[in-house]
Amino acid sequence: MEGLVYKSTGSWYVVKDIATGAAYDCRIKGRFRLKGIKNTNPIAVGDRVTFEVEEGTKGIITEIKPRDNYIIRRSVNLSKQTHIIASNIDLAFLVVTLNNPLTSTTFIDRFLVTAEAYGIKTILLFNKIDTYNAEEIDEVKFLAQLYRQAGYECIGISAATGKNIAKVMTAMEGKTCVVSGHSGSGKSTLINAIDPELHLKTAAISEQHLQGQHTTTFAEMFDLPNGARIIDTPGIRGFGMVEIEKEELTDYFPEFFALKHHCKFHNCLHTDEPQCAIKEALEEGTIAWSRYKSYLQILNGEERDN
């Protein structure tokens, strides 16, 4: 039977039969698990799989179909292992907040580079705009302009009040979408605003650490009335980069890619080389210094997100 993975708990997977929509609790066939996969999760939400029904609503996954794409990051404290956040994605939403918790530009850029590398369109959602003062609203506008200049769509939203949620729903129509961001950024509140019938758990920010409490432990996909599917993911504190070669990195910063052919050297890394179009654009102010800083950190293999 052909199915789609809707939920992963690490050892069990909820798989929906593509033909009937019936849900089955499946596990991985033993030998299939031991193929030397270095991911912490060999099967991800969004995967297309072949499975066999054992009894009732229990089943065994026997094959993963080739993935169109996926979003991947290095696992926490397990530098040799990776974690696939979700697969077969049409559109990613990154939920950004100025504070409680702070989403740094470095974190945003790491996520965007990974999405670019796998051909996944990303929209930045600046959440909680109903809670910001005038100075903070100006900062949101500045950041949104910075990322629009780099080629990204940005929407200011309030998941709590419903502001601009209709815009988000229009963008999602008929697509498989993933919602990502830090714990406490409002991902589950956003999904509840999109479809109140889902009743996803939400939690307040920890006052002591100003970080979100994890309310989503495992990734899970939901069907929406507008023909879309939305994947809710656990909050991410750090975003370790994987699988990107130094020579390719420029290609995943759209505003760098547009200029790289004007560099004197075809293999220019935009660090110390003469007549570099990217560094000239930096001096002219057409490329943001924060983006260049993120580029250098990723290029040099630095793992910090600030």
Residue ranges of predicted features:
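Catalytic P-loop NTPase motifs of RecA-like helicase/translocase cores
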Residues: 102, 132, 163, 237-240
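N-terminal accessory targeting/assembly segments
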Residues: 1-105
